[in-house]
Amino acid sequence: MKNPTLKKHYIFFIGEELPQPEAHLVQSTNAANAAANLGYSTVLVYPDKGAKAINPVNLARPFQPRQTPTELVKYYNLHDKLKVAPLPMPWPIDHFRSKFTDSNTIASKYYLPFHILPTTKLVHSRNWNFVKAAIKNGVPAIYEHHHHEDKPFEPEIVTNPLLQIAVTVVDTIRESMIKNGMPPEKVIKLHNGFNRLFMQRQPEKATEWRQKLLADESQKLVVYAGALQQFKGIDVLIDVAHEMPNVQFACAGGKPTEVESYQQLVKEKQIHNIKFLGYVLHNELASLLQAADVLAHPHCSGKAATFTSPLKLFDYFASGTPIVSTKIPSLVEFQDTQSITAWCEPDNPSKFAESLKWVLETHPRKVEGYPDSIEFVKQFSWENRAAKILSYVDESLLPQLIV
């Protein structure tokens, strides 16, 4: 007979290796971190394809929750309560296109029922196959779904009482989930959150960033943080930089290939006042946002503008730095707040440049930040988000508190 007291863990499953600079991985790791900060016995589970994956000891006992490695802590700005359990995925896993050598299949069909299940109270994942496997094995689950898909949900899963709640970030995706078979009462919209470490003022580190990026103390600094993709408005920002040659622009984020591509583009266009910094570790990003005179959110119009819930926007708020943003459908609810300093139409470099110039003239940089956005963002902490999600879980199914 199974001992119910052994079932204590709140499992967050990610189907990709860590760390990587993808926004969805930042979201998932911070969601797990928040649950741990609330006092739940939280374990972040993800595939490990490194040298340790072939260690016989790890293969014999693959689920071993442990302290989060320093590399992950710095990469995602995590705290010390979160545990991790990398699942060994030795060769030939993911080296051949086959269901039997797919790491997600192995995690769902083997590691979950035989190794993770005995101590698991609740599962939380953006991986639908893992959520399905948990429910089929009698484990309650929470599903996160942040992008439009046309694939219908399996009725036997979405109507199963073990599926506690599904979470998305904008109403348009909630509507498409319902259209695809998710019961309306089982899906909620919740914004992403901000990491509370972004609220800690770091004036010395901010000064170091300005000294590193600016030619002299009188120059202004505009910072963008996020993915380096066209729909995010990077090409627009490059054109804005061309219109404002005396202002320094800096972009944090992107894969090395994307950084190289944009560096080549600005070189060809002979634009010398925009720098691409690549992925900036989260423990360094907070001070970069505080170093800026203005933060840019130049998202373009189009399909992505209807469902994006930009993670970095909440970190922008926490920095207290003035923000210029394009008006896109998914941000409509913020237009009546004081959190964003200036709005302009998307896809228009000249209008964005006008807004930046106005903010630079009317909102001088404050070392302590502007209080409006700092106060506004407090409601969007990852911990508040985690608590809200867990309020939809049956009390008898909640994981163990270890505070």
Annotate the PLM regions.
Residues 3-28, 45-49:
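Nucleotide-activated donor-dependent transferases that construct or modify glycoconjugates
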Residues 250, 260-287:
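Nucleotide-activated donor-binding/catalytic signature segment of Leloir-type glycosyltransferases, i.e.
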